[in-house]
Amino acid sequence: MATDIARLIDHTLLKADATKEQILQLCKEAQTYQFASVCINPYWVKLAAEQLKEDKHVAVCTVIGFPLGQSTPETKAFETKNAIANGATEVDMVINIAALKDKQDQMVLNDIRAVVDAAKDKALTKVILETCLLTNEEKERACALAVQAGADYVKTSTGFSTGGATVEDIALMRRVVGADVGVKASGGIRDLAAVNAMVEAGATRIGASAGVAIVTGATGSSGY
């Protein structure tokens, strides 16, 4: 059971003050518990890839255009290619939230597609919506655009804004993307009950900094 739960979790450490020692510990924990991935800032990708090169079950996930999503599609594409060159096999990109709110759907589509194309056949792409900043209509539109762009997953949150994952948002996202696209719940998930609620609502991946606490039955602290 704990292993099944662990395989859903992106073991996450995205704080600006994370140290090399902490990243190495994150990788060690990911190997011990067999988490789906470690999710880290781009600076640490090369180190994590080196640490995990003998482990075929733990992916190296990083973030693109993070946490605001306000860099250009060209910049996001470069970040993606650079991360993959350094060993990333999954990328979580933040959409252009302003463009979505301005109803510039073609811009949002191009932005997501720039990352999807840069990652094609080399890394999974997860699209972060930052749901706490969006209306339900905007969430639906963002999900539809992510599917149209060819993304592998849609994801709720960066963990750095005003809110995290909710069961309601996961259910909405699952309804819009259908069965063939993954849904990642992230932000504020700190215990097994929260994981189970998200999975029941339709999540197929969980982003959490409290992965060890979740699989061992403790309660994790806040923070991403």
From Swiss-Prot:
Q: Which keywords has UniProt assigned to this entry? A: Cytoplasm, Lyase, Schiff base
What InterPro entries does the annotation carry? Aldolase_TIM, DeoC, DeoC/FbaB/LacD_aldolase, DeoC_typeI
In which pathway does this enzyme or protein participate? Answer: Carbohydrate degradation; 2-deoxy-D-ribose 1-phosphate degradation; D-glyceraldehyde 3-phosphate and acetaldehyde from 2-deoxy-alpha-D-ribose 1-phosphate: step 2/2
Q: Which GO terms label this protein's molecular function in UniProt?
A: deoxyribose-phosphate aldolase activity
The catalysed reaction is: 2-deoxy-D-ribose 5-phosphate = D-glyceraldehyde 3-phosphate + acetaldehyde
Compartment annotation: Cytoplasm
State the SMART domains in the record: DeoC
Q: Name the Gene3D superfamilies on file.
A: Aldolase class I (3.20.20.70)
GO CC terms in record: cytoplasm
Matching Pfam families: DeoC (PF01791)
Instruction: State whether keyword Cell membrane applies.
Output: no
Question: Which E.C. number(s) belong to this protein?
Answer: 4.1.2.4
What is a biological process (GO) this protein takes part in?
Answer: 2-deoxyribose 1-phosphate catabolic process
- Kindly identify the residues recorded as the active site: 92, 155, 184
Alphabetical list of HAMAP family matching this protein: DeoC_type1 (MF_00114)
Q: What does this protein do?
A: Catalyzes a reversible aldol reaction between acetaldehyde and D-glyceraldehyde 3-phosphate to generate 2-deoxy-D-ribose 5-phosphate.
Q: Which family does it belong to?
A: Belongs to the DeoC/FbaB aldolase family. DeoC type 1 subfamily.
The record's listing under PANTHER family reads: DEOXYRIBOSE-PHOSPHATE ALDOLASE
Q: What is this protein called?
A: Deoxyribose-phosphate aldolase
Question: From what organism does this protein derive?
Answer: Shouchella clausii (strain KSM-K16) (Alkalihalobacillus clausii)
